[in-house]
């Protein structure tokens, strides 16, 4: 009581602390979720279970009690995460990142116009136009980006489709169908093949029940479900069924132990929606760029503000100048350019099977330095295939070609005939109907993955399995179960009208225990020690390849004792199941996709670390990792070194092993420091038998190392990791809806190789955005300098606001976008991933090149044209200095030029606007050269060539647009742009040529002296 009372006066309990408390609370909850599932229901006996949930295990709950629990716990549904309202998303597009800069510009323009309107009788409307145009640019681009991204991000909607609609419960001893949302803890539920499990269940009885847990644990094989407690870990024990997994075959009854958000699936959902998502690398780059540009703008603005006060301008005029300079620094067209470039790349990636959900993720993929890939279905084909067989004391590779051209053994061997017969008959898998025209390997089957693999293998090498089964009809069968680990069936023999054959398959060591002889070259010989050793070696060799091995045996039943029509009893066995004849082994694997080894190799040369994270067995995981090159030739794990030196693993120095296979159970006990140690010191890592929460821990570990992490995944279990990663990649075909929602990108063909294509596109767009920005920024200098000289030298204004807009939003747009289509200069995939700390999109060197070098040459070209035109009209440069006040004075209609001619205000203005038009045309001419030099950053343009058709179109388009603006009748009234003499177009040509030569020489020095002074100062 005392503590509670004292709390009110505690000054420390401010709101800030509470805010912090909330955040800490959330972090604590997330940490809780990251831990493994804690429950003990799988360990309880049925009586204890009934007592715990106060339920009669045969009659179920009473209706009244179910109502009470429903009122207490709420419906059995997942809480949808807080979604961002659409208007907020739209506002983010309008006011995020780059747009802020343009909004500030627009507001400053309106401010300047307001000041002018208050001071002058007839204010010029330039600032008003500029403000309106800036606002329009932001709004149009914002709508465009919003439209591009509106097709995404609704994480939980997909969980909704996963929730089963109906459930079959037993209440008060009666079966009833109810809505799955009304299922409560303690309910007695029945599930059958084809159903979705309505909540987390503890099985109390089952008949051949198998569930598909792949979306939860990543195990592709259907898992048997029975009442026995088989494993400490609730995710692996047989007597628990999980919410929203599928029951594949059989039936089961169970007691509900968790509903809604408290289920294992619910925890994952909460985990995924509660994760903080970091900003994308490109968003940080654009922010950095805005800081740079704003810095330059404010520096110039303030310097000239002070200068104009010193030169004797009034305060208000100086403020107008300040605003004018800041606005002139804003690259109006760049926002649209960046958005369009990213969109184009996104479209290009979609054609290559990478569907990008938000535009910024396009570039993130390019800066990726670590890929954590799922094994099943991404690196492998997710189709079990027979890989090897062992018979006649030899290991043979299976031939999986359609035309059987790759046969590595003699198909006439009588042992092979016997083995193929057992594999075909002792097999419940069948092809689904109507697939006669599809190649065997691509046909859909009904049945378990291993049996389907055997079915396809035998169909390919021995012809129709259905006909084989018709010729040898089945008379009895014992299906596979986990206690005796074999499957057995008895068939009438086609080659003997009276007798039967018993065929059996199962775990190799169990099958061998039941055999007394072995079939070699078609003859039965006794199973001696030598043959048992041969079997053991073959079994170990195939198992070591990560393959799933099955043993096969048979027994020809004597027709005297078992004539046709004999009633075989599979419960009270009235036939022999011992002293059988062993025939051979067959091993299966989910083979790697064809394009993966090459893709992993490309990642390696691109400096990207590929880590395999799988729920599968370590041996299988390691075998596939070696098969696809994640563990490369000659690299050993600690276990390999120990085996080679014949010493215990504990004596091997872990630093000596380049590769490393980490078991999920070891990972569970590791501190984050130990995990960091592994990630730092091993180049090639495989995590096996991992849980969904661990995937998240691995991603966070990589991010602590400063890596930009891409994660692939297809199950619900992957969604937290997909969301946490810098870029989450979901599978389009096999992926669950949830994983697709959590991801930033979807692989339409589920192929790891497509990721590598995506990385290449991402790196290319980063390079090309640099080029686009360099091109766009350069014309800022010839746009700002006229204004500065107008202030300092008091000359008539050389370039007006309207003409600046014609450049930024007119002639420069298409060329800037065309650079997005530029091909890579060198092999992008041979260099290291970019370092986000040092390799920026826009750096000081790019600004110095654009503003300080190329921009200056462009400005000279513009001023040259300006002075030429005024001189031709009689105003020599010496006469222009200090003429501004008289020139802009409306009442002065007799201003003399250098030759004594008098000019009225209107005549002067026509000459001035003709100068604006010519200055504009000069900028277009020098931007030709700028566009061509921006094609490359290191290579010569002659090496790169002019293959970019869009770029050539851009050159023609900007020239045509400039000519149209100058010569179109009526432009003099609309935009105050006047027709030019043809010769005036040529004034800027020498400057254009100078830019081209200057830059080619710079790049030549760059290539000759890599790492030298020129590279340090000018290579952006």
From Swiss-Prot:
Transmembrane region(s): 86-106, 130-150, 287-306, 319-336, 770-789, 800-820, 841-863, 916-935, 949-967, 983-1003
Gene Ontology MF terms in the entry: ATP binding; ATP hydrolysis activity; metal ion binding; P-type sodium:potassium-exchanging transporter activity
Residues that hold Mg(2+) according to the record: 714, 718
Region (Disordered): 1-31, 212-231
CC annotations in GO: cell projection; plasma membrane; sodium:potassium-exchanging ATPase complex
Subcellular location: Membrane; Cell membrane
Main enzyme class: translocase
PTM sites of type Phosphoserine: 10, 439, 450, 559, 587, 672, 826, 940
Positions of post-translational Phosphothreonine modification: 570
Protein's UniProt name: Sodium/potassium-transporting ATPase subunit alpha-2
Species: Sus scrofa (Pig)
Organism lineage string: Eukaryota, Metazoa, Chordata, Craniata, Vertebrata
């Amino acid at each position: 009581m005392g503590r509670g009372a004292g709390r009110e006066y505690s000054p420390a309990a401010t709101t800030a602390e509470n805010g912090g408390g909330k955040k800490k609370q959330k972090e604590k909850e997330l940490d809780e979720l990251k831990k493994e599932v804690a429950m003990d229901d799988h360990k309880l006996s049925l009586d204890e279970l009934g007592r715990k949930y106060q339920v009669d295990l045969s009659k179920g709950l009473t209706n009244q009690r179910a109502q009470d629990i429903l009122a207490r716990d709420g419906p059995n549904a997942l809480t949808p995460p807080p979604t961002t309202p659409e208007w907020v998303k739209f506002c983010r597009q309008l006011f995020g990142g780059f747009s802020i800069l343009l909004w500030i510009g627009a507001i400053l323009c309106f401010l300047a116009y307001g000041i002018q309107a208050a001071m002058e009788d007839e204010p010029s409307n330039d600032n008003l136009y500029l403000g309106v145009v800036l606002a329009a640019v932001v709004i149009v681009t914002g709508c465009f980006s919003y439209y591009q991204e509106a097709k995404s991000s609704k994480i939980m909607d997909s969980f909704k489709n996963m929730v089963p609609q109906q459930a079959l419960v037993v209440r008060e001893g009666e079966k009833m169908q109810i809505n799955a949302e009304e299922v409560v803890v303690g309910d007695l539920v029945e599930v059958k093949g084809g159903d979705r499990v309505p909540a987390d269940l503890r099985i109390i009885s089952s008949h051949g029940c198998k569930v598909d847990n792949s979306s939860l644990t990543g195990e592709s094989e259907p898992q048997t479900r029975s009442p026995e407690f088989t494993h400490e870990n609730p995710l692996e024990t047989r007597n628990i069924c999980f919410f929203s997994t599928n029951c594949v075959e059989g039936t089961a009854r169970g007691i509900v132990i968790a509903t809604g958000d408290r289920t294992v699936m619910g925890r994952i959902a909460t985990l995924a929606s509660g994760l903080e998502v970091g900003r994308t690398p490109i968003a940080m780059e654009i922010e950095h760029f805005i800081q740079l540009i704003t810095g330059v703008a404010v520096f110039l603005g303030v310097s000239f503000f002070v200068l104009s006060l010193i030169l004797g301008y009034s305060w208000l005029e100086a403020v107008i100048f300040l605003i004018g300079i800041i606005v002139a620094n804003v690259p109006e067209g760049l926002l649209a350019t960046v958005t369009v470039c990213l969109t184009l790349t996104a479209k290009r990636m979609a054609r290559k099977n990478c569907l990008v959900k938000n535009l910024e993720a396009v570039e993130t993929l390019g800066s990726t330095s670590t890929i954590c890939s799922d094994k099943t279905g991404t690196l492998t084909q997710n189709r079990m295939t027979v890989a090897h067989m062992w018979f006649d004391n030899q290991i043979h590779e299976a031939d999986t070609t359609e035309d059987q051209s790759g046969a590595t053994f003699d198909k006439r061997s009588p042992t092979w005939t016997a083995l193929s017969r057992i594999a075909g008959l002792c097999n419940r898998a069948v092809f689904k109907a109507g697939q006669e025209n599809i190649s065997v390997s691509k046909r859909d089957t009904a049945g378990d993955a291993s049996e389907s693999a055997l079915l396809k293998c035998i169909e390919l090498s021995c012809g129709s399995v259905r006909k084989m089964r018709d010729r040898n009809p089945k008379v009895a069968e014992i299906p596979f179960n986990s206690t005796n680990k074999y499957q057995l069936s008895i068939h009438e023999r086609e080659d003997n009208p009276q007798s039967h054959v018993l065929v059996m398959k199962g775990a190799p060591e169990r099958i061998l225990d039941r055999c007394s002889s072995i079939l070699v070259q078609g003859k039965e010989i006794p199973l001696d020690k030598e043959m048992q050793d041969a079997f053991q070696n073959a079994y170990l060799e195939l198992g070591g390849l990560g393959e799933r091995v099955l043993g096969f045996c048979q027994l020809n039943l004597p027709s005297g004792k078992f004539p046709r029509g004999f009633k075989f009893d599979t419960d009270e066995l009235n036939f022999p199941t011992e002293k059988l004849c062993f025939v051979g082994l067959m091993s299966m694997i989910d083979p790697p996709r064809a394009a993966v080894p090459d893709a992993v190799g490309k990642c390696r040369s691109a400096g990207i670390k590929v880590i395999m994270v799988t729920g599968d067995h370590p041996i299988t995981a390691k075998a596939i990792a070696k098969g696809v090159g994640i563990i490369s030739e000659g690299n050993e794990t600690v276990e390999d070194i120990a085996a080679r030196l014949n010493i215990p693993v504990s004596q091997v120095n872990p630093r000596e092993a380049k590769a490393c296979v980490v078991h999920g159970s070891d990972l569970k006990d590791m501190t984050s420091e130990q995990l960091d140690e592994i990630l730092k010191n091993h180049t090639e890592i495989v995590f096996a038998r991992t849980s969904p929460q661990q995937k998240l821990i691995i991603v966070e570990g990589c991010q602590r190392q400063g890596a930009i992490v891409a994660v692939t995944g297809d199950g619900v279990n992957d969604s937290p990791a997909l969301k946490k990663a810098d870029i989450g990649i979901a599978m389009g075909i096999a992926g669950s809806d949830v994983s697709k929602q959590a991801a930033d990108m979807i692989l339409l063909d589920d192929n790891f190789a497509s990721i590598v294509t995506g990385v290449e596109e991402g790196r290319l767009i980063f390079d090309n955005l640099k080029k686009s920005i360099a091109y766009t920024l350069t014309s800022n200098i010839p746009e700002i300098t006229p204004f500065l000289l107008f202030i300092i030298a008091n000359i008539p204004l050389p370039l007006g606001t309207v003409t600046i807009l014609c450049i930024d939003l007119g002639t420069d747009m298409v060329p800037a976008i065309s650079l997005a289509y530029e091909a890579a200069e060198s092999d992008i995939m041979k260099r290291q991933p970019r370092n986000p700390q040092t390799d920026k999109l826009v750096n000081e060197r790019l600004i110095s090149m654009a503003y300080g070098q190329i921009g200056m040459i462009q400005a000279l070209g513009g001023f040259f044209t300006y002075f030429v035109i005024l001189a031709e009209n009689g105003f020599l440069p010496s006469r222009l200095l200090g003429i501004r006040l008289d020139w802009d004075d409306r009442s002065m209609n007799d201003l003399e030029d250098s030759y004594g001619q008098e000019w009225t205000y209107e005549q002067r203005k026509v000459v001035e606007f003709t100068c604006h038009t010519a200055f504009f045309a000069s900028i277009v001419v020098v931007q030709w050269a700028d566009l061509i030099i921006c094609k490359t950053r290191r290579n010569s343009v002659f090496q790169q060539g002019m293959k970019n058709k869009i770029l050539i179109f851009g050159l023609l388009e900007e020239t045509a647009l400039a000519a149209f603006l100058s010569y179109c009748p009526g432009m003099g009234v609309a935009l105050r742009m006047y027709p030019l003499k043809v010769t005036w177009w040529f004034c800027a040509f020498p400057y254009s040529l100078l830019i081209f030569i200057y830059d080619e020489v710079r790049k030549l020095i760059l290539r000759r002296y890599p790492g030298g002074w020129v590279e340090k100062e000018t290579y952006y």
